[in-house]
Amino acid sequence: MKNPFVIKAYESRELFCDRNDELQLMLRNCINHTDMTLISQRRIGKTGLILRLFDEIATVHPDIHTIYVDIFSSRNIDDFIKLLAEAIMKAFKPKTTLGEKLMAFIKTMRPQLTFDNITGEPQLMIAYQSPHEKEYTLRGLLDFLDSQSIHIIIAIDEFQQIRDYPEANMEALLRTYIQQTRNLTFIYCGSNKHLMADIFTNEKKPFYSSTAFVSLGKISTESYATFIRRLFNECGREIDDDSIAFILDWTRRHTYYTQQLCHTIFANGDLQTDISKVKTACEQLMQQGEAVYLQYRQMLTIKQWNYLIAVAKEGSVSQITAAQFLGRHKIGSASTSQRLADALCEKGLLNDDINVKGVTYSVNDVFLSHWLERL
């Protein structure tokens, strides 16, 4: 029996939990040609929501076409163009009218076209004579799509990667080309919320105030509990209410970790799940991650490691400069605490959640947090 608790981005709407409000908001934005920036902490389900949105669009608005491109692996404008072109080719199959037009256009770039041995997906290699030719190719791709007189949604995942490109003008270049299109709608998302926020909220940057923001929080306890119970029951298995409550509390309703724990519980094969079975799965997950967690210890200073433990033992900390927190964990001064928190946020080990009451810090990896609590 296939495990219904998906730990990759998206499989089907039946195996996707809630997000109905966010889905409808994004759908309205797409229909009305409103570009969006999706902001949330890591592993909360941004990519899954985008793919769920595309699934919905294919059903209710089949005249709208969708393209998804993940640029996490990109290092420069060359890689960006390559990944975008490959994503476009994947979206528009060669035997369709638009696909044939696309292939004719791609050939004008004089590419070396190969196919992945495993997936069969097209892979491009494009040789450029000058930086100007790269810019011309990027603009040409967007102009080609825009000229088809059909509505196309382009989702760019890990968009903050453009900040690491050696081409200092990449943001300005993209913004200039994108704002001239009429039939393209863009969705930007990324796992580094600080860089994403700076790209879109810094008034000195090209993308400032160019999109609507969609904030992705945690799924409600009620929705997730109903979802978990349904998937177990549909597969002929039982799970009691106390077990579900423990799962949601232990994973802090963080999408990736909730899915991972439920996936592990289901994989263990018990027809009836109680809290003891849930705790067994929790132990398995922490043991599986232990080798990685010990590597973190090697890459951090002693003070940083001890600070990470302190935050884990607290669960979350909203006043990292408070005397009580500093004294309880022998951290030192308030400035030391802030410096350590900033360093660990920069390394991606701490999450700083900004809310109306201030900033709350927690360990990014929920399983790591529970493992650290024991030290």
Per-region residue spans from a language model:
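C-terminal leucine-rich, beta-strand-based interaction scaffolds used for sensing/assembly
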Residues: K2-F5, Q287, A291-L375
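P-loop NTPase nucleotide-binding core
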Residues: S40-I44, G48-I153
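Alpha-helical DNA-recognition elements
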Residues: E56, L173, T264, A343-K347
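Short regulatory helix/loop adjacent to the ATP-binding pocket of P-loop NTPases
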Residues: K193-T211
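Amphipathic alpha-helical "lid/sensor" segments that cap RecA-like P-loop NTPase cores
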Residues: A225, R229-V292, I302
